[in-house]
């Protein structure tokens, strides 16, 4: 059963401007600890950061909470499996929060074209979970 659907469309120029103005501190406010290695290894750090930010926003929208504790940018890590498929890894407190709400699965899709990044997240819950 669908718990929630979230989408986010982001103009990556906003992220580039933030990096230009605030430097790596800007990235540190967005990235979860698990994302830093891939960020620094990326050929396009601003593009990487834009995709992470959009996915996190879409995740918060699918959850229906917005970005507020424990649903914070640094508690949500956008990761990739061995085939490149994106998924969300959550910090322990966020994992517990999801479990309390009956969220059992998640699906993430990311796309970009030019300066625009699109993220789409679907969260599932068990059929016995009440709204």
Curated annotation (Swiss-Prot):
Which InterPro entries is this protein grouped with? 4-PPantetheinyl_Trfase_dom, 4-PPantetheinyl_Trfase_dom_sf, ACPS, Ppantetheine-prot_Trfase_dom
One GO cellular-component annotation of the UniProt record comes to: cytoplasm
Q: What is its EC number?
A: 2.7.8.7
Q: Which UniProt keywords apply?
A: Cytoplasm, Fatty acid biosynthesis, Fatty acid metabolism, Lipid biosynthesis, Lipid metabolism, Magnesium, Metal-binding, Transferase
Which coarse location class describes where this protein primarily resides?
cytoplasm
Check the record and name the Pfam families matching this protein. Answer: ACPS (PF01648)
State the similarity comment.
Belongs to the P-Pant transferase superfamily. AcpS family.
Alphabetical list of HAMAP family matching this protein:
AcpS (MF_00101)
Name the record gives this protein: Holo-[acyl-carrier-protein] synthase
Species annotation: Thiobacillus denitrificans (strain ATCC 25259 / T1)
Q: Identify the taxonomic lineage of the organism of origin.
A: Bacteria, Pseudomonadati, Pseudomonadota, Betaproteobacteria, Nitrosomonadales
* Gene name of the record: acpS
């Amino acid at each position: 059963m669908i718990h929630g659907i979230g989408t986010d469309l982001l103009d990556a120029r906003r992220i580039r401007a933030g990096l230009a103005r605030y430097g790596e501190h800007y990235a540190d406010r967005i990235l979860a600890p698990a994302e830093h290695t891939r960020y620094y290894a990326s050929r396009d750090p601003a593009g990487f950061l834009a995709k992470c930010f959009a996915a996190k926003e879409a995740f918060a929208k699918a959850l229906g909470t917005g970005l507020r504790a424990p649903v914070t940018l640094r508690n949500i890590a956008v990761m990739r499996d061995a085939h490149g498929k994106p998924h969300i890894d959550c910090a322990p407190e966020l994992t517990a929060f999801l479990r309390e709400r009956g969220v059992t699965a998640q699906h993430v899709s990311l796309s970009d074209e030019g300066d625009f990044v699109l993220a789409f997240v679907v969260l599932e819950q068990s059929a016995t979970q009440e709204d």
